[in-house]
């Protein structure tokens, strides 16, 4: 069926805003197509998704003009009940989507609302649990699962409805690299088996393109900039111009002077012809030069039950000015490590800080030394307004109003939030809330800053601004610890990486060496970046190519 979903000259403006968020949108999506909606923060892509699933106009009110139809019916005339049977949404944060006390109850929720008979309901739940490989988890609490498992449960909970439209709102935001790849493969399989119209809203272009998409729609400032095949988009400079991270191999090939005009297929490195490509001389890997020890963690173990250690005898040192990545699969113990370092979780570790034993610190005393930004911003926010949230720590420490205003404005500008200084936090996106929490910790200037997934949900512009700011802090002597699933971040912006696997340190090395260890990557659910695949095709050292890439990106690493 042609034009299953259609926006024609469609404009939408929230009641609380003075300018339209969507401006003259013309977009048609045929039935069964798989479309990626791409764009920087604030571009309007999430608003488009909210129009599609009924959050607009049922929850978020506003004014619209033009035409928006689903299956040739005015979408805004459909009840939220009717819309729920047309569009199934998998949210960015699966914890916000769970209803049931067990996985089975959660999957069955939509069926219960439709008064499906118990026997049929059980059969449907078991069928989808088996297809999504979560059958052994049916009796578990959703909140106890890993990130990848949570996404599968969320997906099962919407697939039981058999809706013709599947909407994914940044499904990769909180997943380790291998789990993200697995989810994209699963989405592609479901798309093909169900013949569903599949719409993916996502920042991580390269990860989405791991599987085929029919079309990419690029948004900026509420307008469509590009609407076409991914291969053609990758030949343009639109991605870098509009704040979207290019696939690593595309950026590297541009720096190498590769002629894309003769290239038909851009989404697979295997399809490129490198016979005429000239390879410049490349230097050896930079070594970490940090030697001034700031923090020594000795024999850290954490157990949530009597049988298993979440962390088992973890020891490592952290140096002044060092940028350290903590990586590993979902559920490996990375966030537990951060919480233990901040005294949020009882532990018997010995901590030596600036040659002083601080193992008996209170939480308040530890906070003066180590700042921690949580992965989920909603768990940190306590104030209604952006300014008040960022200013709270300074107010509790007795700073003057003038000093508070000056410092808050400075940090908001750095974090790309100055224009929202008088906004209610409830009006911000997930990525914007994340920046608010980062700002609230950075303003206190702790010597060690731990950030749990600092760039999750951030577009390239704000990602680059944030990482450049963290680089400046490290140059000033701050030690930056980043818990991340982003292998490109680890490559470009850290000096060292620790891999956690099942509560143990599996590796502690330079990021490039970590990503060169195929056996380690497979074991710990990490994956090589496309630079390594490109190096294999070019027949050169992946370490040298990666160092060359970093040098040509402005020398951000080191």
Curated annotation (Swiss-Prot):
Belongs to the ABC transporter superfamily. InterPro entries: AAA+_ATPase, ABC_Co_transporter, ABC_transporter-like_ATP-bd, ABC_transporter-like_CS, ABC_transpr_CbiO/EcfA_su, ECF_ABC_transporter_ATP-bd, P-loop_NTPase. Residues 5-246, 295-527 form the ABC transporter domain. Pfam families: ABC_tran, DUF3744. GO terms for molecular function: ATP binding; ATP hydrolysis activity; ATPase-coupled transmembrane transporter activity. GO terms for cellular component: ATP-binding cassette (ABC) transporter complex. It is a peripheral membrane protein. ATP 2 binds at residues 328-335. This is Putative ABC transporter ATP-binding protein gbs1680. Disulfide bonds: none annotated. Keywords: ATP-binding, Cell membrane, Membrane, Nucleotide-binding, Repeat, Translocase, Transport. It comes from the Bacteria. It is found in: Cell membrane. It is an enzyme of class 7 (translocase). ATP 1 binds at residues 39-46. Its EC number is 7.-.-.-. Probably part of an ABC transporter complex. Responsible for energy coupling to the transport system. CDD domains: ABC_cobalt_CbiO_domain1.
């Amino acid at each position: 069926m042609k034009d299953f979903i259609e926006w024609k000259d469609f404009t939408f403006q929230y009641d609380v805003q003075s300018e339209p968020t969507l401006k003259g949108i013309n977009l048609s999506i045929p039935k069964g197509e798989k479309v990626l909606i791409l764009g920087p923060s604030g571009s309007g892509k999430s608003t488009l998704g909210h129009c599609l699933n009924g959050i607009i106009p049922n929850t978020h009110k506003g004014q619209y003009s033009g035409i928006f139809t689903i299956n040739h019916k005015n979408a805004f005339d459909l009840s939220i009940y009717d819309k729920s049977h047309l569009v199934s949404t998998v949210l960015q944060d699966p914890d916000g989507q769970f209803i049931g006390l067990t996985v089975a109850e959660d999957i069955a929720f939509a069926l219960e609302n439709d008064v499906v008979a118990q026997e049929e309901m059980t059969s449907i739940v078991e069928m989808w649990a088996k297809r999504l490989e979560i059958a052994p988890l049916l009796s578990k609490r959703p909140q106890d699962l890993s990130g990848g498992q949570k996404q599968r449960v969320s997906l099962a909970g919407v697939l039981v409805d058999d809706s013709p439209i599947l909407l994914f709102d940044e499904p990769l935001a909180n997943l380790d690299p291998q789990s993200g790849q697995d989810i994209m493969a699963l989405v592609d399989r479901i798309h093909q088996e169900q013949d569903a119209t599949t719409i993916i809203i996502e920042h991580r272009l390269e990860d989405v393109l791991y599987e085929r998409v029919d079309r990419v729609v690029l948004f900026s400032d509420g307008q469509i900039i590009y609407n076409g095949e991914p291969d053609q988009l990758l030949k343009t400079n639109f991605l870098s111009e509009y704040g979207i991270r290019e696939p690593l191999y595309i950026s590297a090939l541009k720096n190498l002077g590769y002629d894309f005009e003769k290239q038909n297929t851009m989404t697979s490195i295997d399809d490129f012809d490198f016979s005429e490509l000239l390879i410049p001389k490349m230097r050896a890997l930079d070594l970490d030069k940090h030697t001034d020890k700031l923090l020594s963690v000795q024999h850290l173990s954490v157990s949530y039950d009597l049988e298993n250690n979440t962390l088992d005898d973890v020891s490592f040192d952290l140096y002044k000015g060092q940028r350290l990545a903590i990586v590993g699969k979902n559920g490996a113990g990375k966030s537990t490590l951060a919480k233990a370092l901040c005294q949020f979780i009882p532990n018997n570790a010995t901590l030596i800080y600036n040659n002083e034993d601080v193992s008996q610190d209170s939480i308040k005393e530890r906070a003066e030394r180590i700042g921690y930004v949580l992965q989920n911003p909603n768990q940190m926010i306590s104030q209604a307004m952006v300014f008040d949230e960022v200013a709270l720590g300074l107010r509790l420490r007795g700073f003057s109003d003038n000093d508070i205003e000056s410092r808050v404005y400075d940090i908001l500008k750095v974090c790309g939030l100055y224009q929202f200084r008088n906004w209610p936090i409830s009006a911000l996106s997930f990525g914007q809330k994340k920046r608010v929490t980062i700002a609230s910790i950075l303003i206190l200037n702790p010597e060690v800053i731990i950030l749990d997934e600092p760039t999750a949900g951030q577009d390239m512009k704000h990602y680059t601004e944030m990482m450049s700011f963290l680089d400046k802090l490290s140059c000033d002597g701050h030690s930056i610890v980043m818990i991340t699933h982003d292998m490109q971040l680890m490559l470009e912006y850290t000096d060292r990486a620790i891999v956690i696997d099942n509560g143990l340190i599996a590796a502690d090395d330079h990021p490039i060496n970590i990503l060169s260890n195929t056996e380690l990557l497979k074991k710990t659910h990490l994956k090589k970046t496309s630079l390594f695949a490109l190096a294999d095709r070019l027949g050169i050292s992946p370490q040298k190519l990666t160092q060359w890439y970093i040098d040509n990106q402005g020398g951000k690493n080191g």
